[in-house]
């Protein structure tokens, strides 16, 4: 009695219905509100939940519409990494996710960028950014 408990918010990544593009949008929102979650948990199917039904069936039980559910460990890792994009360990996964979603605009030194390429940290970075943007523009 009388103990004070600290609430620790956490996020669940790879929730059924969440695509990689959705995860990028969430990362932008987290950046905009200045929040970097310390704890992120991958979605784990649990018996009796609508989310689990969506995960296994690929269908939203409320709407009957198809939903995406990340099942591949690498896809799940990219969604998780995006929520903690400032963590240096997630750098490669964040870069890959941004490339897959054609969001090269979030790689660079602008304040809105999720993945910084500051030339002071990496002398090859500026060339890499130019090459990446050129590659993305050719795809469009």
Task: Give the role of each language-model region.
Residues 28, 32, 42, 99-100, ...:
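Ordered, helix-dominated protein-protein interaction surfaces in large eukaryotic regulatory proteins
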Residues 47-140:
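Radical SAM enzyme core and accessory elements
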Residues 6-20, 41-46:
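Conserved strand-turn element in the central/C-terminal portion of the radical SAM core barrel
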Residues 1-5:
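Short, small-residue-biased leader/transition segments that mark boundaries at the very start
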Residues 16-31:
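Catalytic cores of alpha/beta
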